[in-house]
UniProtKB/Swiss-Prot annotation:
This is Methionine--tRNA ligase. It comes from Serratia proteamaculans (strain 568). Its cofactor is Zn(2+). Zn(2+) binds at C146, C149, C159, C162. Residues 573-675 form the tRNA-binding domain. The lineage of its organism: Bacteria, Pseudomonadati, Pseudomonadota, Gammaproteobacteria, Enterobacterales. The gene is metG. A motif ('HIGH' region) lies at residues 15-25. Is required not only for elongation of protein synthesis but also for the initiation of all mRNA translation through initiator tRNA(fMet) aminoacylation.
C-alpha cells in the first residue's frame, strides 16, 4: 500500500538583517535543505520558508552609522542573504522579511488575542537607560557579569555560558554596549506576556516528543527554576512595529520574529493562490510544522513561541530540530585568523556542494558542535566524492561512449551486487528522515567502496584490449554506471549541483523509487568532468580573503591609517630593548641643523648625549630642561657630524610640529627601567 504523502511546513531560524551570512549560519540552512530535499524525493508536499529578522535596536543603530534608513539597509541585506542561500542551493519556496505587511497584521492579531484572553499584563518597571545616548537600552545592548554563573561579558537577556535568562537589571556591573557608560535606572510602562500561565501545557509539550532529549532535559531545569513573565515591549526610539493603542511602545523583536515564519508563509500563500494558510496554522491542523534552529535560541522557541501560539489559538510546532555551533580548525571562528568566513567569500573560491557534503558527513540528530577542519575538509571531499564516486563514472563512461556510442548493456553483469545497493535504500532513508545524515554518508561511502572494488576486480581497461570481449566490456562498464547512478540518487539531497550534472550525463532524472530498475539498453550522454578536486591553495586563498574582508569592514582612520602597526615581534625581541627614565638636564640648538636638538640626559648616575630630530616641535629647547622623558638606553652609539648620539628619546606623532615627547607618570625616577 503506497504511503500517504504528508504536508510539511519547514523553517530555518531567521538571519538577522544587520550582517552577512557566514559558514556558521550555513550549517543550519544546509541541514534543513538536505532534510527537505529528501522529503520531496519521497513524495511529501514540503513548503520550505525563511525570512530576514529585520527589527530591533541593532538595525536602527547600524543604519544610523551608515547614514541610511533602516528600510534601505534591510532591503540590501535581504538581497545579499538570498543570493548567498541560492549559491548554496538552499531550496526555499519563499524568503521574506519580518518588516512586512503580513507580519504586522499577524503580530497585531496574536497580540490582540493574547490580550483579549488575559495573557498580557502591563506594569511600570525600572529599566536601564544610557545617559550619554539618551535611550533605553535593549537587553542585547547591555553587557555585564551573569547573575547566575558569574561569567563575565554576557548580554542583558541571557547567558551564553549557562543558558540562564534574566532581566538586564540583574546583571552585575552592567555597561552600555552603545557608549560604554554605566546605565542608570529609569521608570517606564511595559507590557508582559504571562508565560507562567502556560507552564503545565509547556511541560506536557516538552515530553510529547516535540524536542530532542537534550533540549527537553534543559527545559526541565528552567521549569524547576520557575518561568517568569516576559517583557514584550520596547520604548522608542526603536525600529519595529508599534504596539496598537500604545504610542511610543514597540513589539520586542523576539515577539514578531517567530511570527515571521507565519508571515513568510502567508506571503507565499497570497502569491500562489493554491495554498491555504489556515490549513497549516489552525489549532487542529493535521499538517506538520518543523523549525530548524541553533541551540542559542532554544529558550525562545521552546517556551515563548509555543505559549504564544497556544494563547492565540494557533497550532504548535510538531518538532524543533536543534543543532550545535560551528568551529573552524578546532576553535571559535576568528576574523583575525581568517576562519570567520562569509558565505559569499566561500562561493567565490569553492563549490557549494563541497561544504554541503562535509557538513552532511558530520551532522547527526544530536546537538553536538561541528568542527570544520579545513585540511580534513579538503581530504574528505577529494577522497570520497572525487576518488570514489565521480571516479566510478569517469573510469567506465569513456569505454561506453567510445566503444558503444553511449549505449548501456541490455543486462546487468552482477544482479546480486546491484540488489545489495538497492536494498540499502531503506537504511539510508531512515538515516535521512531522522537527520542522521552522517550515518547516511557512511553507508553510501561503504557502497562506493564496493562499487570500486567491483571495477578493480573486473579491470575493464584490461578487457578492452582483449579481442572478442566487447560484450563483457559493455556489461562491466554498464554495471559501474548503474552503481554510480544509485550512489548519486542517495547523494541527491546533499549535492544538488553534482546531481544536476549527473542527470545530464545519465540522461535521466534521479529518483528514490526508480533505482529499483537498472538502466538497461539506455543511452547516456558523452561524459564531461562532473566535479573538480579541491585545491588546498584555493582554501588558503579563501582564508586570506576572509582576513581582507575583516580589514575592509573596519574603516581605519587617524594615526593607524597613516602609520599602520608593524609586523608582530616576539616577547624575546621586545625584551632586548632597554628603555629607561631620563632627566633632561640641558637642551640646545645644534649649529648647522634646522631639525636637531642636543639633549643631555641624566640616567641617575650616568649622563648621555643625544641628538633628536624634534626641533620643529620645540622652538624653545630650554622649556624641556628639568623634564623627565623615556629613552632607549642600549641603542648602539651613532657617530654624527655634530658628535656622537648615545641613544634615542621616545616621541609620538607624524612629524614636523606634531611631535610629542613622551613623559612618565609622576613618581618615576631617572634610571628606572620601563617594563
Amino acid at each position: 500500500m503506497p504511503q500517504v504523502a504528508k504536508k510539511l511546513l519547514v523553517t530555518c531560524a531567521l538571519p538577522y538583517a544587520n550582517g552577512s551570512i557566514h559558514l556558521g549560519h550555513m550549517l543550519e540552512h544546509i541541514q534543513a535543505d538536505i532534510w527537505v530535499r529528501y522529503q520531496r524525493m519521497r513524495g511529501n508536499e514540503v513548503h520550505f520558508i525563511c525570512a530576514d529578522d529585520a527589527h530591533g535596536t541593532p538595525i536602527m543603530l547600524k543604519a544610523q552609522q551608515l547614514g541610511i534608513k533602516p528600510e534601505e539597509m534591510i532591503a540590501e541585506m535581504s538581497q545579499e542573504h538570498q543570493q548567498d542561500f541560492a549559491g548554496f542551493g538552499i531550496s526555499y519556496d519563499n524568503y521574506h522579511s519580518t518588516h512586512s505587511d503580513e507580519n504586522r497584521e499577524l503580530s497585531n492579531l496574536i497580540y490582540g488575542r493574547l490580550k483579549e484572553n488575559g495573557f498580557i499584563k502591563n506594569r511600570t518597571i525600572s529599566q536601564l537607560y544610557d545617559p550619554e545616548k539618551g535611550m533605553f537600552l535593549p537587553d542585547r545592548f547591555v553587557k555585564g557579569t551573569c547573575p547566575k554563573c558569574k561569567s563575565p561579558d554576557q548580554y542583558g537577556d541571557n547567558c551564553e555560558v549557562c543558558g540562564a535568562t534574566y532581566s538586564p537589571t540583574e546583571l552585575i556591573d552592567p555597561k552600555s554596549v552603545v557608549s560604554g557608560a554605566t546605565p542608570v535606572l529609569r521608570d517606564s510602562e511595559h507590557f508582559f506576556f504571562d508565560l507562567p500561565s502556560f507552564s503545565e501545557m509547556l511541560q506536557a509539550w516538552t515530553r510529547s516528543g516535540a524536542l530532542q532529549e537534550q533540549v527537553a532535559n534543559k527545559m526541565q531545569e528552567w521549569f524547576e527554576s520557575g518561568l517568569q513573565q516576559w517583557d514584550i515591549s520596547r520604548d522608542a526610539p526603536y525600529f519595529g512595529f508599534e504596539i496598537p493603542d500604545a504610542p511610543g511602545k514597540y513589539f520586542y523583536v523576539w515577539l514578531d520574529a517567530p511570527i515571521g515564519y507565519m508571515g513568510s508563509f502567508k506571503n507565499l500563500c497570497d502569491k500562489r493562490g493554491d495554498l491555504d494558510f489556515d490549513e497549516f496554522w489552525r489549532k487542529d491542523s493535521t499538517t506538520e510544522l518543523y523549525h530548524f534552529i541553533g541551540k542559542d535560541i532554544v529558550y525562545f522557541h521552546s517556551l515563548f513561541w509555543p505559549a504564544m501560539l497556544e494563547g492565540s489559538n494557533f497550532r504548535k510546532p510538531t518538532n524543533l530540530f536543534v543543532h550545535g555551533y560551528v568551529t573552524v580548525n578546532g576553535a571559535k571562528m576568528s576574523k583575525s585568523r581568517g576562519t570567520f568566513i562569509k558565505a559569499g567569500t566561500y562561493l567565490q573560491h569553492l563549490d557549494a556542494d563541497c561544504l554541503r557534503y562535509y557538513y552532511a558527513a558530520k551532522l547527526s540528530s544530536r546537538i553536538d558542535d561541528i568542527d570544520l577542519n579545513l585540511e580534513d575538509f579538503v581530504q574528505r571531499v577529494n577522497a570520497d566524492i572525487v576518488n570514489k564516486v565521480v571516479n566510478l563514472a569517469s573510469r567506465n563512461a569513456g569505454f561506453i561512449s567510445k566503444r558503444f556510442g553511449g549505449q548501456l548493456a541490455d543486462k546487468l553483469a552482477d544482479p546480486a551486487l546491484y540488489q545489495t545497493f538497492v536494498d540499502a535504500a531503506q537504511s539510508i532513508a531512515e538515516a535521512y528522515a531522522s537527520r542522521e545524515s552522517g550515518r547516511a554518508i557512511r553507508e553510501i561511502m561503504a557502497l562506493a567502496d564496493l562499487a570500486n572494488r567491483y571495477v578493480d576486480e573486473q579491470a575493464p581497461w584490461v578487457v578492452a584490449k582483449q579481442e572478442g570481449r566487447d560484450a563483457d566490456l559493455q556489461a562491466i562498464c554498464s554495471m559501474g554506471i548503474n552503481l554510480f547512478r544509485v550512489l548519486m540518487t542517495y547523494l541527491k539531497p546533499v549535492m544538488p549541483s553534482l546531481t544536476e550534472r549527473t542527470e545530464a550525463f545519465l540522461n535521466c532524472e534521479l529518483s528514490w523509487d526508480s533505482i529499483q530498475q537498472p538502466l538497461l539498453g539506455h543511452q547516456v550522454n558523452p561524459f564531461k568532468a562532473l566535479f573538480n578536486r579541491i585545491d588546498l591553495d584555493k582554501v588558503n586563498e579563501m582564508v586570506s580573503a576572509s582576513k581582507e574582508d575583516m580589514v575592509a569592514a573596519k574603516v581605519v582612520t587617524g594615526p593607524l591609517a597613516e602609520d599602520p602597526i608593524q609586523d608582530t615581534i616576539t616577547f624575546d625581541d621586545f625584551a632586548k630593548v632597554d628603555m629607561r627614565i631620563a632627566l633632561i638636564t640641558s637642551a640646545d640648538f645644534v649649529d648647522g641643523s634646522d631639525k636637531l636638538l642636543k639633549l643631555q640626559l641624566d640616567l641617575g648616575g650616568e649622563t648621555r648625549q643625544i641628538f633628536s630630530g624634534i626641533r620643529s616641535a620645540y622652538p624653545d629647547p630650554k622649556a624641556l630642561e628639568g623634564r623627565l622623558t623615556i629613552m632607549v638606553a642600549n641603542l648602539a652609539p651613532r657617530k654624527m657630524r655634530f658628535g656622537i648620539s648615545e641613544g634615542m628619546v621616545m616621541a609620538a606623532g607624524p612629524g614636523g610640529k606634531e611631535i610629542f615627547l613622551l613623559s612618565p607618570d609622576s613618581g618615576a625616577q631617572p634610571g628606572m627601567q620601563v617594563k
